[in-house]
Amino acid sequence: MANTNSAKKRIQIAERNRLENKNYKSTVRTLMKRCFVACGIFEKEPGDESKADLQKTFNLAFSKIDKAVKKGVLHKNTGANQKSRLSVALKKVLKEVV
């Protein structure tokens, strides 16, 4: 139990930051899953519309990962690893379709 007011405030701030970071990480994971689903859709039905949706989804995921790294929510190596996984999946799908 915190004794001083400053310690109590730090507990509140830490909890607030924990929840914000949790939300951010959850969003990144959700966007990554959407990317993999979009890859599957594009693989089954290649077309201009599904390719545009695929690019849009990947751009959004890359942006969110970069922002998470910038804010310190994710370590830079973790962000790079996630972006690499997405890139490999994208290149694999585009290579198979072409």
Swiss-Prot record:
It holds the Pfam family Ribosomal_S20p. The keyword Lyase does not apply. InterPro entries: Ribosomal_bS20, Ribosomal_bS20_sf. GO terms for cellular component: small ribosomal subunit. One of its GO terms (biological process) is translation. Transmembrane segments: none annotated. GO terms for molecular function: small ribosomal subunit rRNA binding; structural constituent of ribosome. Keywords: Ribonucleoprotein, Ribosomal protein, RNA-binding, rRNA-binding. It comes from the Bacteria. Binds directly to 16S ribosomal RNA. Belongs to the bacterial ribosomal protein bS20 family. This is Small ribosomal subunit protein bS20. It comes from Prochlorococcus marinus (strain NATL2A). The gene is rpsT.
